[in-house]
């Protein structure tokens, strides 16, 4: 008799994706983050569902309903902080996952990579709309500033912004629709993640060497299931330390003040995971130019396969490219720091230089360095 997991139509899909999946024998812990993202997504959907049971998406009661969740709902505080800090863990895993893809040349799987970029955009949109929901000062002004950027689009800009707002300013209609979108998008993300996985399993996983591992595969279970569980335990440990010891570490104190359209906070800034893009936006004095740079900073990922000039896929044996990669990481950390600073000297010039360097490394230095490395190996 055939094993039910290999014959049952539904079990067969799960079996081929998570149990009998042939995986390279040498993938490192950098390959753990895909499964960690899946865990983050499940955690966010579950905590979000319980929060939605008590939250009200009305400008007069939204702030109070979040306070009510924290004070009166059984374990509401832990659900709220798991959700808020879970988003931070989600983005840490996302950035490492994308960084792994860049380092080891995983972007050569075109369909998987492009779906991944779409996923990144969708998760960023979801997180932005979620940040608006508590209706604190930073929620309101963050929503006003970021949506207002669309007015830079020629001809249709103003109409587009008013259409998104549902009025002439960020108000009740905006909050209600943001809640609706914030609720539905994670399910769209889940569907996209399934497609992401589908395309990945067409080719099989990449590995640190960047060369084919078809001759040396091992079953996903038990080898990588146990490895993923260890990674998940580490992540949950970090998340719980954050939630139980310093839940507001990554938040903004301004968001504990109810939204007031008549009082602008001194420094409007998004959550930490958007600061690098916010710094790039602010470093260009022109509104439309800034918006284009902001979009380009993420959209540039789609160009990665076209910018790959090396004869080797991975950076494992390319020390010059490795130096550039870590320069890029340092540059992104610098941009993140600048995004949280006020717009004054010397932060303006540091932000502008870091923004130029970001695009320079990806568009110019990396492709040229790859060609130099090819020539050094006389290829």
Curated annotation (Swiss-Prot):
The chain crosses the membrane at residues 33-53, 77-98, 113-133, 178-198, 226-246, 288-308, 320-340, 347-367. Keywords: Electron transport, Heme, Iron, Membrane, Metal-binding, Mitochondrion, Mitochondrion inner membrane, Respiratory chain, Transmembrane, Transmembrane helix, Transport, Ubiquinone. The keyword Membrane applies. Pfam families: Cytochrom_B_C (PF00032), Cytochrome_B (PF00033). GO terms for cellular component: mitochondrial inner membrane; respiratory chain complex III. A ubiquinone binds at residue 201. The keyword Hydrolase does not apply. One of its GO terms (molecular function) is ubiquinol-cytochrome-c reductase activity. Heme b b566 binds at residues 97, 196. Its cofactor is heme b. Belongs to the cytochrome b family. Heme 1 (or BL or b562) is low-potential and absorbs at about 562 nm, and heme 2 (or BH or b566) is high-potential and absorbs at about 566 nm. Component of the ubiquinol-cytochrome c reductase complex (complex III or cytochrome b-c1 complex) that is part of the mitochondrial respiratory chain. The b-c1 complex mediates electron transfer from ubiquinol to cytochrome c. Contributes to the generation of a proton gradient across the mitochondrial membrane that is then used for ATP synthesis. This is Cytochrome b. It comes from Sus philippensis (Philippine warty pig). The lineage of its organism: Eukaryota, Metazoa, Chordata, Craniata, Vertebrata. The gene is MT-CYB.
